[in-house]
Amino acid sequence: MRRLIALLCLLCLVLALPLSGLAQKQEIPDISVLDEEMIPPTPLGMKHYLLLCMDSWGAKMNNLGFSDGMVLVTVDEVNQRMITTSFIRDMLVLHPDNKPGRLTYIVREFGVQGLVDTINRHFGIEIEKYFVMDWSQVSSIVDAVGGVDLTITDGEASYLKRYAISPSSTKPAINSGGRYHFSGHAAVIYMRTRRVPALNGDPHDIGRTYRTRLVLSSIAESLKDVSYEKARAILDSVMKNILATNMTTSDVLEAFNTVYAMRGTPVEQFRLPIDGTHKLFIYYGGDSQLMDFEANRKALKDFMFGNTFVVH
């Protein structure tokens, strides 16, 4: 009987132990964000458009999953600049409920506007307009502009040859590193590649963001001499291949006319996070990237705005 009582007492002591004694306590990351009133206004003549691609070939607005590609297109009419800024999907941020989590999860839980608001307060910008699409729609858009010419490495060529893409989806068929003309489907597979470094050496998700920016800039370069009529036809195809936008018809036409007037302008590229400002962080068992947001806000401000205003 005494032995049974002793065992029961020991069991009670074990059950009374805090969970932190049985498992490693999750470290709470320090993430710096801005209050809404601290976000500086967008300079006159500059517009931001968030291009958001869902991680699906058949996304539905009433059941959106994870966001995969997130690229900010900035059109600066005053200074004649066009900029693409990409965001890695696994960066650790504060969600709209102020709980930490990966950027890719926000749309599923808080909607597209929740993602826009999150990017704004983490990076000190005022995104107002967005386009939402999925991978099949991106494929159709690339086909609508006539495909895209891309230079790939031997490593990328080897990976793409093993992937389920038709040899006829590039011209010529991929054999080794070199320059190829990609169809829409092949371009999507290329942009999603993460197992081999990109042309510039960037690995993993950072390499994926580089490939996306490269496709966008390559398309822009191919359209520098496009006629107005052809450009309008491409715009019609683009608008037929989006899930959603918060832009009115007037907004779209205004943006189109501005971009058309600036055709031929070199597309500048930027990536968040910048080198040396992020590290691997395990959050509840999943890999994420913990960033120095103050350093990234300053870098974005310096690149995009110069001395127009100060980002705290």
Features from the language model and the residues they span:
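Sec-dependent N-terminal signal peptides of Gram-positive bacterial secreted proteins and lipoproteins
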Residues: R3-A23
